[in-house]
A protein has these predicted regions:
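Histidine/lysine/aspartate-rich catalytic loop segments that bind and position anionic ligands
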Residues: 10, 14, 20-61
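Catalytic cores of alpha/beta
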Residues: 9, 31-45, 69-79, 85-104
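Glycine-rich phosphate-binding active-site loops on the catalytic face of alpha/beta enzymes
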Residues: 1-4, 47-60, 97-119
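Active-site pocket-lining/capping segments in soluble small-molecule metabolic enzymes
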Residues: 30, 80, 99-135, 139
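Alpha-helix-loop-beta-strand connector modules within alpha/beta enzyme cores
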Residues: 5-27, 63-87, 125-148
């Protein structure tokens, strides 16, 4: 909503349409004006989890609020930290926040299978136009390893 509250009317419609499918409230949560009111509203809607960086640029920076949300949520909803979660900080985010589920991309740059490459044309951005970011099993394993 324009005032930074959760759009309860449209979320209720979404929840109805989802039926028995678990719904994660995405990082729009990080743009709410009152995260504790938003937490209670989202719980009342029946969402299964909230994906959040703790209203900060990264989950590590938002770990303080994440910890408060995890405590207030209890067993009613899962608080899932996301944004900047990597193998070098996931254990610290877990320790600081008390969260048990995490959202991360575990991506690496991979070359394209394109054989022909036109050196005269770019796709409008810096960097290699023939590279793509892909999630790799190696990075997933490396990211979750510190939690074991």
């Amino acid at each position: 909503n324009p005032d930074g509250s959760v759009d309860m009317k449209n979320m209720a419609l979404l929840m109805e349409a989802a039926g028995d499918t678990p719904v994660t409230f995405h990082r729009a949560f990080d743009h709410t004006s009152d995260p504790f009111k938003a937490l209670e509203d989202i719980i009342s809607l029946g969402c299964a989890r909230i994906l959040t960086s703790g209203c900060r640029p990264t989950a590590l920076e938002g770990a303080g609020l994440l910890a408060e949300l995890v405590t207030k949520a209890g067993e009613r909803i899962i608080i899932m930290p996301g944004c900047g979660v990597r193998e070098n900080n996931i254990a610290e985010i877990a320790r600081l926040s008390g969260a048990r589920e995490f959202h991360f991309s575990a991506r690496e740059s991979a070359g394209s299978n394109m054989i022909f490459r036109n050196p005269e044309v770019t796709m409008g951005s810096e960097g290699d136009p023939y590279a793509i970011d892909v999630t790799t099993a190696r990075r997933v394993a490396a990211t979750i390893a510190p939690l074991k």
